[in-house]
Amino acid sequence: DSHDVHTAYVSHISHVTSFALALTVLETEKDEKHIFDLASGGFSSTVRMAKSSAEMWTPILEQNRDNVLHVIDTYLEKMRLFRDAIADYDGGRITELIHEANRIKKILR
């Protein structure tokens, strides 16, 4: 169903990404004070969805499993592009990727 595909792209991946980032930070930053002191508005906005209910999101992710898995794979490919550009000290490629991502501004004003 096309609705499920689009929902996986614009809603479900945002929640999964937020949950994963929160887990990454919580695992690395054992001292909660560091998280609080260093957290910027961008971080807070990004992990805001990690406060969402597991009881609500588990069935949603299970019901739309195939689409969510496809979107996660696509997301990981994009993360790999950033990782490779950063590892290669390729500022031009990093800039290119960011400019490409900035096109979202035309959609989300």
Please tell me what each predicted stretch does.
Residues D1-H15, K33:
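Conserved Rossmann-fold dehydrogenase catalytic segment
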Residues V10, T17, I98-A101:
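Short alpha-helical scaffolding segments that buttress acidic/His motifs in well-ordered protein cores
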Residues T17, L21-K33, I60:
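N-terminal glycine-rich phosphate-binding loop for ADP-containing cofactors
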Residues D31-A101:
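Interdomain hinge/lid region at the active-site interface
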Residues I107-R109:
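Amphipathic alpha-helical coiled-coil segments
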